[in-house]
């Protein structure tokens, strides 16, 4: 038996999931102490409830994917609209360093996946499937490569395993980012900032998700218009480039379109973009997207994972936490920005870029802004990382072919 939630039902439940997350994080000290994002808390609890329901009578639940996709695109578009070219240029050396670190993580994930699977006596392709293809790559990349695994290595249930591995990574990417940041902050003895201080419009978007904003009806309408135009252009470019060398995920086109539109308006037409409205709409899009993504998790699919693959994934989670603490944090300067970047790296290193942003928001809402982190992570996680992952996966495939 299967039940599909309508658009309105999905939106209503996602909103309740977020409110549940806010309620629990505010009242349960351990969740607040370790900076666990509210959508992860609420969404995971609902996912567990649906798992119990599924075990009782076998009912599966489906949610409106169009709403989830739209909220994701709104979020990435708002990231683009919040970026000035002058800020992008400032990314400079730290951006290159973080990109190199992200590539190093991909290499490490694949080495650990292959080595662990061989030590456990299973086909090394299973270890590779529990590596960067599903962790750094996420559900989309994992599902896209699953057929290749099935045909090239004759793996049984490759698609199901890929989705389950990506689900595992998404959950733990949202869980370990906060504790990693907490551990590093304790080293620095970083104090909290008040949560309800007002911030002005020149503050970077997304860094203060709980702070008050000054928004007018006009600024909100102008921002909705900008986002709508960017979504339209991004979707058009996605359709036009499909099957070509320029093919990219839709959200990347929307992000780049947002950057172009923002800088044309700011630098040519001298239009003052309402950062506060972009911030609010982007944060709302991110929260609703994550809530739907988390409550859509079919946790019973994890039960289908072989114990050997689960062991490989557990090793990957420990490796990600250690990598963020000893590599990402140190390479990015061992300062507060490096702490926030480390939390974000846990998010997209195991899950997805929205999870990374949620991890960073959970930190910055309590300990202060990090302009560098909110500039670098979306750029690397949303675009560059997929290209690097694809290139390194081809090398890993060749290695598995030799070892198999």
UniProtKB/Swiss-Prot annotation:
Top-level lineage group: Bacteria
Keyword field contains Nucleus: no
Swiss-Prot/TrEMBL keywords: Amino-acid transport, Cell inner membrane, Cell membrane, Ion transport, Membrane, Sodium, Sodium transport, Symport, Transmembrane, Transmembrane helix, Transport
Parts of the chain that traverse the membrane: 5-25, 33-53, 69-89, 95-115, 161-181, 219-239, 245-265, 277-297, 307-327, 338-358, 373-393
Xref: InterPro entries: GltS (IPR004445)
Membrane protein topology class: Multi-pass membrane protein
Keyword Cell membrane: yes
Cited Pfam families: Glt_symporter
Gene Ontology CC: one annotated term: plasma membrane
Family: Belongs to the glutamate:Na(+) symporter (ESS) (TC 2.A.27) family.
Protein name: Sodium/glutamate symporter
Lineage: Bacteria, Pseudomonadati, Pseudomonadota, Gammaproteobacteria, Pasteurellales
């Amino acid at each position: 038996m299967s039940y599909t939630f309508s658009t309105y039902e999905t939106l209503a439940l996602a909103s309740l999931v977020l409110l549940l997350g806010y309620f629990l994080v505010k009242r349960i000290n351990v969740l607040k102490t370790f900076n666990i994002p509210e959508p992860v808390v609420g969404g995971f609890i609902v996912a567990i409830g649906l798992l119990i329901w599924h075990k009782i009578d076998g009912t599966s639940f489906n949610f409106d994917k169009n709403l989830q996709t739209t909220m994701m695109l709104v979020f990435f578009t708002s990231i683009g609209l919040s970026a000035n070219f002058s800020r992008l240029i400032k990314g400079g050396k730290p951006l290159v360093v973080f990109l190199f670190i992200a590539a190093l993580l991909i290499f490490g994930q694949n080495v650990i996946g292959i080595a662990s699977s061989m030590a456990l006596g299973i086909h090394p392709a299973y270890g590779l499937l529990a590596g960067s293809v599903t962790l750094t790559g996420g559900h989309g990349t994992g599902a896209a490569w699953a057929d290749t695994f099935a045909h090239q290595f004759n793996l049984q249930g490759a698609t199901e395993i890929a989705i389950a591995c990506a689900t595992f990574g998404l959950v733990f990417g949202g869980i370990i980012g906060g504790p990693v940041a907490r551990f590093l902050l304790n080293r620095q003895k970083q104090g909290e900032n008040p949560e309800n201080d007002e911030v002005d419009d020149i503050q970077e978007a997304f860094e203060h998700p709980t702070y008050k904003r000054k928004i007018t009806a006009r600024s909100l309408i102008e921002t909705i218009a900008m986002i709508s135009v960017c979504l339209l252009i991004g979707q058009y470019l996605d359709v036009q480039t499909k099957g070509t060398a320029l093919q990219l995920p839709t959200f990347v086109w929307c992000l780049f379109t947002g950057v172009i539109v923002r800088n044309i308006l700011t630098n040519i037409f001298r239009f003052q973009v309402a950062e506060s409205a972009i911030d609010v709409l982007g944060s709302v899009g991110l929260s609703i997207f994550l809530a739907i993504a988390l409550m859509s998790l079919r946790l019973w699919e994890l039960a289908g994972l072989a114990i050997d693959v689960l062991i490989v994934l557990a090793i990957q989670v420990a490796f990600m936490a250690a990598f963020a603490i000893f590599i990402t944090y140190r390479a990015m300067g061992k300062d507060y920005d490096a702490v926030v970047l480390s939390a974000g790296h846990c998010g997209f290193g195991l899950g997805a870029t929205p999870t990374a942003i949620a991890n960073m928001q959970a930190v910055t809402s309590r300990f202060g802004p990090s302009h560098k982190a909110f500039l670098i992570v979306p750029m690397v996680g949303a675009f560059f990382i997929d290209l690097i992952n694809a290139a390194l996966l081809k090398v890993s495939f060749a290695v598995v072919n030799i070892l198999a």
